[in-house]
A protein has these predicted regions:
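Long cytosolic C-terminal regulatory regions of eukaryotic multi-pass membrane proteins
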Residues: 109, 148-151
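Ser/Thr-centric signal marking residues that sit
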Residues: 129, 141
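Key DNA-contact positions within bacterial/archaeal DNA-binding proteins
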Residues: 75, 127-128
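Membrane-proximal linker segments that couple transmembrane helices to downstream signaling/catalytic modules
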Residues: 2-108, 112, 116-117, 133-136, ...
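The short coil/loop that forms the "turn" connecting the two helices of the helix-turn-helix
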Residues: 72, 124-125
Length: 151
């Protein structure tokens, strides 16, 4: 290699295979401001609204809607969801949607419904997001899961 090539190589950042970069630890500014008592109270209210009232079935129910209902802002809500549930808002909704879908896919009363209809019943806006969330949570496709239980 020439001296010019060596200098260029020294100046350029080290390239990792497949453009992988070191994952940086994210620290949300709001997390340090969360009072544990308020976070616990919000946790209970979030569970009530999302799970008990089954708002997860509404494909248009956003974090903004939930924050408005809880009379807080979306950043604080997001920080509470992340700290108390260990996931972001959309993953939280998708987890409950997938659990509901698992039940409906194996329920004989819904045997006449196709996967797309079931995905709409549990609150997914489209089939692709349903398949992606289902596979992420269960480890197999909705059709594969259903076949396993219908045999």
């Amino acid at each position: 290699m020439s001296d010019l090539e060596n200098k260029k190589q020294e100046q350029s950042p080290k390239k990792r295979p497949y453009n992988l970069r070191e994952k940086k630890e994210k620290k949300a500014a709001y997390r340090s401001l969360i009072r544990p008592e308020l976070a616990d109270e919000l946790y209970d209210k979030i569970l009530n609204i999302v799970v008990v009232q089954k708002k997860y079935k509404d494909p248009d129910f956003s974090a903004k809607d939930l924050a408005k209902e809880l009379q807080t802002n979306t950043r604080y809500l997001s920080a509470v969801v992340n700290s108390r549930f260990g996931m972001n808002y959309s993953c939280l909704l998708n987890e409950y949607r997938v659990k509901d879908a698992m039940h409906l896919l194996t329920d004989k009363r819904y045997a006449d419904k196709n996967v797309e209809e079931i995905s709409a019943l549990v609150g997914f806006a489209n089939r692709q997001s349903f398949y992606a969330a289902f596979y992420k949570n269960v480890g197999e496709t909705p059709n594969g899961y259903r076949r396993k239980f219908m045999e």
